[in-house]
Amino acid sequence: MDSNLRVTVWNEGRHEQTNPIVQKIYPAGLHQPIVTHLQKLGMNVRSATLDEPDHGLTPPVLSETDVLIWWGHRAHDAVRDDIVSQVQQRVIQDGMGLVVLHSGHFSKIFKRLMGTSCDLKWREAGERERIWVVEPGH
């Protein structure tokens, strides 16, 4: 077995298809700079996109992925529930890492794993915020 980290970078790919500015800056997709950088670090990296069969996340791809990087912004609802279930199983049962980027906090997979709506809420009241470090060595 290869000892290098196996990473799959997933991208919904919607901005590249609809925004000429994004197309010009990222002609190979928003995911490609991430793929290229991680490859330079010696990782085995592949990409997957929403428009591929099974969103590029077939069982063989998932079984050969140590870390899944997820980039999503506006096509969260287009991701099939059965694919979300497969990713969830790999994360929870098999220990696959998941790094969720940008607006991926609102993706189906992130919401399912967190068990919340993942709606962003905040207030600006000028109050002091306290953060407790309960496990400094973690």
Per-segment meaning from a language model:
Residues I25-P27, V84-Q89, G115-C118:
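Glycine-rich, phosphate-binding/catalytic loops in enzymes
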Residues L62-K111:
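Short alpha-beta junction capping motif
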Residues M1-E64:
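Aromatic-Pro/Gly-enriched surface loop or interdomain linker
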Residues T36-N44, V79, L98-G104, E129-V134:
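Short C-terminal domain-edge/linker segments immediately following a structured domain
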Residues H105-H138:
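An acidic, glycine-rich "communication" segment
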Residues H31-V35, W70-R74, Q93-G95, R123-E127:
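Glycine-rich loops and low-complexity Gly/Arg-rich segments
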Residues A28-Q32, S85, K108, V134:
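A structural signal for well-ordered alpha-helical segments within the folded catalytic domains
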